[in-house]
């Protein structure tokens, strides 16, 4: 199996850490913060920088313990249950997409401040997203190099303000300092917190980093310190050069500062800010597919997205998927910087609260695991930070008029993950499959004509041919929809062995057969059907199975056992559901006809594969005969 390639060193990871953590706050945060607390926002930057450096140590310890591509999902998996870890992974993915959209919106606003140039701004943004994803597709070396260069450029832009800007400061602009009082200082910290979002992005590259246990923790801490120091000094210089009353009404705040320092030439530096923000967006575009990869590996996302490109060693399917999602999210969020920021912040803080709490839990759960990097003050520190972040959210809800509505909107996006999780578990988890089938047994009965319509049943019977007086195995009979047809067609001397995972499905099937007097139908409950054919099944003339291929955990074993039951030339007909709602595929091997044919051929069957369109999903038909040779079957 193709694996990710370890090529990233400390310089690449540090550059990525700076680019990912920096966010839009470095370039918009001074004005956003000043709009809430005036010059006292400087104090917000100082306090938040200290907290941010401490939070970076949590990610450092976690990646030192679990240096895997899943990052926050992997940490949650080791700490919480399967559902919670998926939801945190889903939340991290939402936060990542919102962050990328926010960065690109901010970048375009610096490049083209005129809001009337909507079409041009949209076209440039789409082209940029596509280019960045193409770079990510073609290898982590090129991606890492570009992000590192852009991080250096970002620092250069900030330094081009700080050092000459010191000599243009008017200290009278910094007074009065507490023009709005002290409470707004904490509200400000909520709104500039995005300036330090992004630690999780670096952890997604653990499997592509040389010696990640040591390199990534150091890069996270150093990167956060660099961003914190630069952001704080930039805020001091900006507020010293331009009164906060002017900054807060400027669409691109640093442009005003550039103009004070460099005059008309300062407008050129807007292009530098644009490139720097795109560099931060690139960090998310490069790293987020690794989160999808980790979820797909654990069958908590579409399994096909875990594939690694044999040449470029990148999760190319996840990158393509992520590119499409990025374009959709950007299209929905275009031109709404303040709304995006308000939506992103509470979701990000909720995610970080869950991640911070993993440290004290894992210290107790795995006390002996090797930790090359440790969080200081672990007995009280995590709880103080969680309390601090939670209090910022409460303060935001209390003071901002629309905060509660925005939070509910954000949580509604998070809640979409619940049905997705249930759907994925139905696909992949045998125990969950049984529970769901049992709970939905009567619903399945009510909707059987939709789930298995008459034309599909007729096609199956046609493929089976003449089954009069034959013995059949129906592998997965559900509520007996097809069983009723089989029962009539094998008369007068035939039999049908109907097996299923669900006891409730079988109870319904039994009642239906009894009501119609079909005593030649033998019903067998098999809770292990995803891994075997029930041992009580005798030799049969043919095998038919509906909707079971996607559930099989050991396909080859089940097919080999079926081969032993049918005579040479004995027929098999398998039908399964794919492309649910025309967009959600089934398990990976059912997506490729050649793979299906190969699996059946290796088990001793010569089969033909066809696909037919349905209303809510499509059908894949696999039919053929037991054969020692790979002969065409018609």
Model-predicted segments: where are they?
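A generic transmembrane alpha-helix motif of multi-pass inner-membrane proteins
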Residues: 379-435
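C-terminal membrane-solvent junction of multi-pass transporters and transport-like membrane proteins
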Residues: 146, 305-312, 352-402
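Helix-loop-helix connectors at the membrane interface of multi-pass transporters/channels
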Residues: 1, 74-79, 103-124, 157, ...
């Amino acid at each position: 199996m193709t694996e990710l390639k370890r090529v990233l060193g400390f310089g690449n990871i540090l550059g990525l850490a700076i680019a990912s953590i920096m966010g839009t706050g470095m370039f918009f945060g001074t004005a956003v913060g000043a709009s809430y607390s005036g010059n006292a926002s400087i104090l917000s930057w100082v306090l938040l920088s200290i907290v941010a450096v401490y939070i970076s140590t949590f990610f450092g310890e976690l990646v030192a313990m679990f240096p895997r591509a899943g990052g926050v999902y992997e940490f949650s998996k080791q700490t919480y249950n399967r559902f919670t870890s998926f939801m945190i992974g889903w939340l991290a993915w939402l936060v990542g997409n919102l962050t990328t959209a926010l960065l690109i919106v901010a970048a375009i606003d610096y490049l083209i401040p005129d809001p009337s140039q909507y079409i041009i701004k949209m076209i440039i943004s789409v082209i940029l997203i596509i280019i960045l994803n193409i770079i990510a597709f073609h290898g982590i070396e090129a991606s890492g190099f570009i992000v590192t260069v852009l991080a250096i450029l970002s620092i250069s832009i900030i330094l081009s303000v700080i050092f000459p800007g010191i000599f243009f400061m008017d200290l009278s602009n910094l007074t009065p300092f507490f023009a709005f009082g002290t409470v707004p200082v904490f509200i400000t910290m909520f709104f500039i917190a995005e300036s330090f979002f992004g630690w999780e992005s670096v952890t997604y590259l653990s499997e592509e980093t040389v010696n990640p246990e040591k390199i990534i923790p150091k890069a996270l801490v150093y990167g956060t310190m660099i961003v914190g120091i630069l952001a704080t000094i930039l805020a001091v210089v900006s507020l010293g050069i331009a009164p906060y009353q002017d900054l807060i009404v400027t669409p691109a705040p640093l442009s005003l500062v550039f103009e004070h320092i460099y005059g008309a030439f300062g407008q050129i530096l807007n292009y530098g800010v644009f490139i720097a923000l795109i560099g931060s967006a690139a960090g998310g575009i490069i790293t987020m597919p690794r989160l999808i990869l980790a979820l797909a590996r654990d069958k908590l996302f579409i399994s096909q997205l875990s594939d690694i490109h044999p040449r470029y060693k990148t999760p190319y399917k996840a990158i393509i998927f992520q590119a499409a999602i990025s374009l959709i999210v950007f299209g929905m969020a275009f031109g709404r910087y303040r709304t995006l920021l308000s939506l992103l912040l509470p979701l990000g803080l909720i995610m970080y609260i869950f991640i911070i709490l993993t440290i004290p839990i894992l210290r107790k759960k795995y006390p002996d695991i090797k930790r090359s990097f440790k969080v200081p003050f672990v007995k009280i520190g995590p709880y103080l930070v969680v309390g601090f972040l939670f209090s910022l959210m409460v303060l935001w809800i209390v003071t901002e008029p629309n905060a509660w509505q925005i939070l509910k909107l954000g949580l509604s996006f998070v809640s979409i993950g619940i049905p997705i999780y249930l759907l994925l578990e139905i696909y992949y988890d045998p125990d969950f499959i049984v529970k769901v089938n049992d709970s939905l047994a009567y619903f399945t009965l009510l909707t059987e004509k939709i789930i298995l319509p008459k034309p599909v049943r007729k096609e199956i019977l046609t493929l089976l041919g003449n089954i009069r007086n034959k013995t059949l195995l129906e592998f997965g009979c559900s509520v007996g929809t097809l069983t009723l047809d089989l029962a009539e067609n094998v008369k007068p001397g035939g039999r049908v062995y109907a097996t299923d995972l669900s006891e409730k499905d079988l109870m319904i099937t039994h009642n239906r057969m009894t009501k119609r007097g079909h005593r030649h139908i033998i019903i067998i409950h098999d809770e292990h059907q995803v891994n075997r054919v029930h041992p009580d099944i005798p030799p049969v003339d043919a095998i038919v199975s509906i909707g079971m291929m996607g559930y099989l955990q050991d396909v080859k074993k089940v097919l080999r056992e079926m081969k032993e039951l049918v005579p040479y030339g004995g027929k098999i007909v398998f039908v399964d559901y794919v492309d649910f709602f025309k967009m959600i595929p089934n398990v990976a091997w059912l997506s490729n006809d050649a793979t299906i044919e190969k699996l059946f051929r290796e088990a001793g069957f010569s089969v033909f594969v066809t696909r037919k369109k349905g209303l809510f999903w499509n059908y894949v038909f696999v039919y053929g005969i037991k054969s020692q040779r790979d002969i065409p079957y018609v």
